[in-house]
Amino acid sequence: ASVFEGNIAVKQKNAGLASQKYEEAIYFDPKCTEAYLKYADIYKSANASLAIEKLNQLKDLEPSNTAVDKKLAEIYYLKNDFNKAVEAYANFAMGPTATEEDLVKYAFALFLNHDFDKSLEVANMGLQKNARHAAFNRLAMYNYTDLKRFDEALKAADVFFKECDKADYSYLDYMYYGHLLESLKKYDDAVVQYEKAVKMDPTKTDLFKNISSAYEQKNDYKKAISAYQKYYASLDKEKQTPDLQFQFGRLYYGAGTQPDSLAITVEERKQALMSADSTFHAIAEAAPDSYLGNFWRARANSALDPETTQGLAKPFYEEVAALLESKNDPHYNSALVECYSYLGYYYLLAIENPALKAEAKANKDKSIEYWSKILAIDPANATAKRALDGIK
């Protein structure tokens, strides 16, 4: 009678009375399975912990009752506790009581839990029963992509986007497809998918970063910079940090040093490198404890002075070397070798410079000092050995 009265209260949308009646039913019959499940239904959204507590009481009484696991899985899934949801689904999802929707949610919970192999296994099980099912094909594409099985991911994507029944595409679908195509070096196709994703959800401005990355990888720096500007402009001022500005500098540097001379004029190359220099200058001032601003400033100036006739990069490499030497950390050895290589070469050229004849001895000593510093870090460094042999 109490369960019946509880059911009437549910129809009347009186949750308080309904839960009271189900509690009564359990009190008079602790094995009244229906009352536990109905009670959990009332609280699954409003108070999940109460619902879970009641279901666990039933689980203790009936450990093999898959209806309990099913309800627990549903509640954990609703509250985004995918770890617990996976545990609950595992108890029944491969058995006869599982519906297609249960399998979808199990596969998705596994995916969100980063168990891509198991998620793929469950999705493929679903596809054996229904090869054109949108959610299973979606998860196959996602999982194959995350597992870096790109050829299989591409096949799944083809089915998902061209053959599925009732497919309701989201920005995430286009984003994943973009990641997949970018991984396969299909950069133009990747951009098309990223653009579809951001059009579908304009708040996902991170996608402009993906668009920029795709263009950068095909050496289309103008478009890469343009897309990155859109991403950067979408951020609040406090989020426009030096590490994000750093990518601007890298893109300008890439544009100025790209090998394809047809894609960029000499003047455009120079302008790009000057933009890189000013960007890295701003970073050096904003983060004085980091060597990266001046290190990349040195690289930009070295590219502006490819013959090292003006020594444009010299003050920056000197500053970086002094900072990194003070840290005394082998982690910075490769950066120090780059600094010493430039400075060693700069002084090597200065030895032969007629205008600096009076300083030839001092320049020779300086060059020897820097090449020797390289050998102290890397005794097998062939460039340093050759340079020292040439000087001596």
Regions found by a protein language model. Give the residues of each.
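Alpha-solenoid helical repeat scaffolds
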Residues: 1-359, 366, 386-392
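Alpha-helical oligomerization segments
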Residues: 369, 374-390
